[in-house]
Amino acid sequence: MAKEQYDALIIYADKEHGSNFEYFTGFIPRFEEGLLIIDKNGKATLVLGNENLKMSKHSRIGANLIHYPQFSLPNQPMDNEKNLTQIFKELKLYKNKKIGLIGWKMFTTQNEEPSELFDLPYFIVDALKNSLSTDTIVTNAAHLLIGPKGIRTINNANELAHYEYGANLASRCILNAMNQLKIGMRETEIGALLSDEGQAHSVITIAAAGERFENANFYPTYKKIKFGEAISMTTGFKGGLSSRTGFLINEERELPENQKDYLERVVIPYYKAIVAWLENISLGMLGGELYEIIDKTLPKASYHWHLNPGHFVADEEWMSSSLSKNSQRQIASGMIFQIDIIPSVAGYTGVSAEECVAIADQSLQNELKVKYPELWERITSRRNYIINELKIDLSPDVLPLSNTVGYLRPFLLEKNKALKVK
């Protein structure tokens, strides 16, 4: 804040867009909206609706509480009703020269000024502007949290331990689903295997066989899976996502007639890119350098992947990404990445082995080893499997947070065969 001369930050949250707010408070306002206002001296104020008033005393950071019942659900009591503009005036925000608004999205457009785009509800932005003098500058400040130097892009040992729980859980679910696949199962049965321990998902659960998006549907249905179909499965929790796509067959000769070369045309080139990603990422490397390595290994012009080949993971599945063309952001200790390469070859089923890893220097690795020995044992076991069984020369800076990093079975009825490096 001080470096960029912000006098105050206003951080917005709702159920779908609460991670920046939750980073400071430890909770989201669920079915209500909420605001966290932090001034340059560290004083914090929570503005909450009816059903979150009780949460203020549990906040990670100490904060004054203001009840704003308009954040509550429709037709609930409007006791203590206040005008939001008046609340902002009472907080004397009009005395500030520069205020940052933080929703969840950091805009990276080239054709508009990103700092002038706001993803908060209009009634909040309008109330704020009506409370300020014309001299006060208001900008989007999400980059302070999730931008190239954002504080949420670097995790300490405790944060890694918490996020490993979600990544581990996702990979356990995906492996369990892969192992239990059998012809005649319903998509909903598979979807049930992709949930566990009552945890909230960070993405929509995918368990889709055959034709995707029938009737514009994203969700698992009662459709029974059939031999020879393609199937996609995805699950994610705070800390990581696991995803797999392949065929419901046992061996290569059972591939569809028009995709007999599926392994050579799609799967093996993709797997080589995953291997290159895991073997080359390292501390100090520029994001643009890893991007170029992936582009050389799996040429974008031929395989038509159009998103980033990886991105930051935290509470949200995609927070932001430093892995873009010409990115000058250095890979740093404490970063968590989703390996996310999505090839699209006309006429062929896709392939996916998305997983989550952390990057850690020796100091952070030593801290994890001492403070979280069980976590470190899991990481060591995963590294040993990747190096010794899959024959991937895993970068020493990479800590696999999930159990299935580098593990790809394209023929999902064959439970005992996976790709490995020759």
Task: Briefly describe each language-model feature range.
Residues M1-K422:
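Active-site neighborhoods and metal-handling regions in enzymes and metal-associated proteins
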